[in-house]
UniProtKB/Swiss-Prot annotation:
Pathway: Amino-acid biosynthesis; L-arginine biosynthesis; N(2)-acetyl-L-ornithine from L-glutamate: step 2/4. It catalyses: N-acetyl-L-glutamate + ATP = N-acetyl-L-glutamyl 5-phosphate + ADP. The record marks K29, K241 as: Transition state stabilizer. Substrate binds at G64, G65, R86, N181. This is Acetylglutamate kinase. It comes from the Bacteria. Coiled coil: none annotated.
């Protein structure tokens, strides 16, 4: 009886959040351990099914950095990063596209379809969904910055009940261009702005944004993010993630969340419990 009462209590705690978010569009950046660990992959698919069944419209943007780095290493191509962004040469661009669009994208799509969601895997090149230009004038090679998102493609899929699964590879400026590798955090942010998503959620391999003592900061305003960057509390690989959060919140997204994808059912814990699990970033 006590166990049943606990289940009822959990459902009642979730109800206000379910009512609040039903009908909303949410962009979910899927990466890290949640994308590699077999158990977490299965649970992520189940979480997306539940969101879908509750009337939430998820849009998934995935990364694939570890698989890309591993395959490049096997081929004798060194991976280089500056400020958390990959430098992409012409040879590695071909590998990036193969891994993101041909391997990971289809695996995620298959998982979701297997669990009863109508998922459609697409690349940013499909129907010119993402158009890009070189990042920092070409300093990062074929790593690009998104300059256009064709939101109507995503709208059309959502209206027909599909869950878009998007590989962050963008179209180049002219026919025959190999395309651009887009940081998945940046791609998720730009897509969230373009489709006017209610939330964007980043699954990572850390609890969220941590303070100087290593404790989780549960909520940050835009100005607090900048303060923590200036002081060096936010540093390294967390910088591109918080920058992506800041950009989408400035662009009209209500809140951005950075959560620990290593925790089972972290998406549900963040969205449907009063305590949450990660860091939310919002306007001042």
């Amino acid at each position: 009886m006590q166990k049943r009462s606990k289940i009822v209590s959990i459902l009642l705690d979730s109800l206000p959040h379910i009512k609040l978010f039903s009908g909303s569009t949410m962009v979910i950046k899927y990466g890290g351990a949640a994308q590699i660990n077999p158990t977490l992959k299965e649970q992520f698919a189940i979480d997306i099914v539940l969101l879908y069944m509750l009337g939430i419209k998820p849009v998934i943007v995935h990364g694939g950095g570890k698989k890309i780095t591993d395959l490049l290493g096997k081929l004798g191509i060194e991976s280089k990063f500056v400020e958390g962004h990959r430098i992409t040469c012409i040879d590695s661009m071909k590998i990036v596209e193969m891994v993101l669009s041909g391997d990971i994208n289809k695996e995620i799509t298959s998982f979701l379809n297997h669990h009863g969601v109508k998922a459609v895997g697409i690349s940013g090149k499909d129907s010119s969904l993402l158009r890009a230009e070189p990042k920092d004038g070409g300093r990062f090679g074929y790593t690009g910055e998104v300059k256009e998102v064709k939101a109507e493609i995503i709208y059309n899929l959502l209206e027909k009940g599909f869950v878009p699964v998007i590989a962050p590879v963008a179209e180049g400026e002219e026919a025959g261009h190999p395309g651009y590798n887009i940081n998945a955090d940046t791609a998720a942010s730009e897509i969230a702005k373009a489709i006017k998503a209610r939330k964007v959620i980043f699954l990572t391999d850390t609890q969220g944004v941590l303070d100087g003592e290593g404790s989780l900061m549960e909520s940050l305003t835009l100005s607090e993010v900048e303060e923590n960057k200036r002081s060096g509390v936010i540093n390294g690989g967390m910088i591109p993630k918080v920058d992506a959060c800041v950009e989408c919140v400035k662009g009209g997204v209500e809140k951005a969340h950075i959560i620990d994808g290593r925790v089972e059912h972290s998406l549900l814990l963040e969205l449907f419990t009063s305590e949450g699990i990660g860091t939310e970033i919002l306007r001042d």
